[in-house]
Design a protein with these regions (language model features):
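A cytosolic-side transmembrane-helix exit/cap motif
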Residues: 56-61, 118, 144-151
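Extracellular-loop-to-transmembrane junctions of the mid-late helices
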Residues: 3-14, 112-142, 163, 169-172, ...
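Alpha-helical transmembrane segments in multipass membrane proteins, preferentially the mid-helix core
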Residues: 21-22, 80-83, 133-153, 181
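Membrane-helix boundary/juxtamembrane motif in polytopic membrane proteins
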Residues: 147-172
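N-terminal low-complexity or simple alpha-helical regulatory segments
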Residues: 1-110, 114, 123-126
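Residue-level detector of conserved catalytic or cofactor/ligand-binding positions
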Residues: 186-191
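Hydrophobic alpha-helical membrane segments
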Residues: 104-105, 166-179
Length: 191
């Protein structure tokens, strides 16, 4: 089996997984606020996977379109941060905060779409790394604060643990750094 066919399959499987889970989370009643945010985050990831599937068609794969869609890919970092922030500080997230967190991504995207100026990519990738580092720090400290709260307020706290959140955030950070590094190599090697 050719490597490219595995890529098709993986994109399709990821699209179906994210789409199905987001549908289940968003249609399940009663649903909590965290389920709704996770459902919306996964719906966004399903759209990203669908976009990647469309890019397998050669007629759609132009340099400007691919570069434009890379900016939308960066929005996934913000989408994941919404879920992590809501998980560690329930009720903190509202539409005003969502807009303020998304606005830099929106500004970079609009700036690129108006100019198609490719040297903006290193600044965008740098912003994503800084934003992610700040989110990782916030989530790490919030998880510690939550752990302390559980220990101080509950007598049986053995199965109430958010240590997994720190590990998951660390793994996400590694994936993000790898993604940004790979994209920066692609854009640095272009003439």
């Amino acid at each position: 089996m050719e490597g490219i066919n595995i890529s098709y399959f993986m994109n399709g499987a990821a699209f179906m997984f994210f789409g199905y889970v987001s549908f289940r989370l968003l249609t399940h009643r009663p649903r909590s606020r965290i389920q709704r945010i996770l459902g919306l985050t996964l719906a966004f990831w399903a759209l990203l996977e669908f976009k990647d599937i469309l890019l397998y068609f050669p007629s759609l794969k132009t340099e400007r379109l691919v570069n434009s869609l890379l900016f939308i890919d960066g929005w996934a970092v913000a989408a994941c941060s919404f879920y992590l922030l809501e998980l560690t500080a329930p009720g903190w997230l509202n539409w005003k905060k969502v807009f303020s967190l998304v606005s830099p991504y929106l500004a970079f995207t609009i700036a690129y779409l108006c100019t198609f100026y490719t040297p903006i990519f290193p600044f965008y990738f740098g912003f994503i790394l800084i934003y992610s580092a700040i989110i990782v720090l916030i989530v790490t400290f919030a998880a510690r604060r939550y752990q302390r709260y559980i220990r101080n307020n509950y007598s049986y706290s053995e199965h109430i643990d958010v240590a997994w959140l720190k590990k998951a955030t660390f793994i996400l950070a590694i994936c993000l750094v790898t993604w940004v590094y790979t994209l920066s190599l692609i854009h640095i090697s272009e003439p």
